[in-house]
From Swiss-Prot:
SUPFAM superfamilies: Ribosomal protein S5 domain 2-like
Record gene name: rpsI
Gene Ontology terms, MF aspect: RNA binding; structural constituent of ribosome
Record organism: Hamiltonella defensa subsp. Acyrthosiphon pisum (strain 5AT)
One GO CC term, this protein: cytosolic small ribosomal subunit
Record keywords, A-Z: Ribonucleoprotein, Ribosomal protein
Similarity field: Belongs to the universal ribosomal protein uS9 family.
GO annotation, biological process: translation
Protein's name according to its UniProt entry: Small ribosomal subunit protein uS9
Length: 130
């Protein structure tokens, strides 16, 4: 790994993101595509930008990201978590500010499994009294 490059792994739901940051002009590449092309949804892009906007570092780093699994929302959350970890690897003094915003904590919520005899995880079949 390059001397001035920092790495962070982020996870959310069933998505996992590998984030590499290095000093640059603010280019973000996700799976060999620009962020705007990869995420059509504005909300997903906003989630990705959150840690950088918080620290006013929007144009200080170039980000190279690979992300696998899950959907749009999970991938965006995984990337945010990865960026946060990479920024902490770059400068540990950023941790309290990122922690206060809630970006350091891994969101542990996962999909609940479907149970036998139920239609979904908790949805029971309709009850008929007679």
């Amino acid at each position: 790994m390059a001397e001035n490059q920092h790495y962070g792994t982020g996870r959310r739901k069933s998505s996992a993101a590998r984030v590499f940051i290095k000093p640059g002009s603010g280019n973000i590449v996700v799976n060999q595509r620009s962020l705007e092309v990869y995420f059509g949804r504005e909300t997903a892009r906003m989630v990705v930008y959150q840690p950088l906007e918080l620290l006013n570092m929007m144009n200080k780093f170039d980000l190279y990201i690979t992300v696998k699994g899950g959907g749009i929302s999970g991938q965006a959350g995984a990337i945010r978590h990865g960026i946060t970890r990479a920024l902490m690897a770059y400068d540990e003094s950023l941790r309290p500010e990122l922690r206060k915003a809630g970006f350091v904590t891994r969101d542990a919520r996962e999909v609940e499994r479907k149970k036998v005899g139920f239609r979904k995880a908790r949805r029971r079949p309709q009850f008929s009294k007679r």
